[in-house]
């Protein structure tokens, strides 16, 4: 039951933050709020993944922040809908949005994992393991 509560709390906070970012509004041409939510959410999930990689497992914290907060904050459904609408109305913008979102999402997640490992000390432990 604690797991459900952790995901619920994180998801509620993440969804509220996503709503706040959406209030900033996007342009009629490019859906900046969703782009910002998904790329920053990828960075945050990467940070959490890297940070908890070498730390004692804290499943409730991980569920609250990873599954709950990041899951509530990021939005695959809005990304998909916006991509389809852009492809139908302005194909070149739709392709740009699709490629930029995927490339930035993956790069930010990778960067987050690297930074998270460095902050937690996991990077040094991995280096020692390979040098032994």
Curated annotation (Swiss-Prot):
Reactions that this protein is recorded to catalyse: fluoride(in) = fluoride(out)
Binding site for Na(+): 71, 74
GO MF term set: fluoride channel activity; metal ion binding
Transmembrane spans: 5-25, 34-54, 59-79, 95-115
Compartments it resides in: Cell membrane
Membrane topology qualifier: Multi-pass membrane protein
Regulation: Na(+) is not transported, but it plays an essential structural role and its presence is essential for fluoride channel function.
Disulfide-bond pairs as recorded: none
InterPro entries noted in UniProt: FluC (IPR003691)
Keywords assigned: Cell membrane, Ion channel, Ion transport, Membrane, Metal-binding, Sodium, Transmembrane, Transmembrane helix, Transport
Primary residence: membrane
Top-level taxon of the source organism: Bacteria
Family indicated by similarity: Belongs to the fluoride channel Fluc/FEX (TC 1.A.43) family.
Protein name per its UniProtKB record: Fluoride-specific ion channel FluC 2
Lineage, highest ranks first: Bacteria, Bacillati, Bacillota, Bacilli, Bacillales
Gene name of the encoded protein: fluC2
């Amino acid at each position: 039951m604690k797991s459900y509560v952790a995901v619920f709390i994180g998801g509620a906070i993440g969804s509220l933050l996503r709503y706040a970012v959406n209030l900033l509004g996007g342009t009629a041409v490019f859906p900046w709020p969703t782009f910002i939510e998904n790329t920053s959410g990828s960075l945050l999930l990467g940070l959490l993944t890297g940070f908890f990689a070498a730390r004692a497992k804290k499943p409730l914290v991980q569920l609250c922040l990873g599954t709950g907060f990041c899951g509530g904050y990021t939005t695959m459904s809005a990304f998909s809908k916006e991509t389809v609408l852009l492809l139908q109305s302005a194909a070149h913008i739709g392709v740009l949005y699709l490629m930029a979102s995927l490339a930035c999402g993956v790069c930010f997640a990778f960067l987050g994992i690297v930074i998270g490992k460095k902050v937690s000390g996991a990077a040094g432990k991995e280096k020692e393991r390979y040098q032994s």
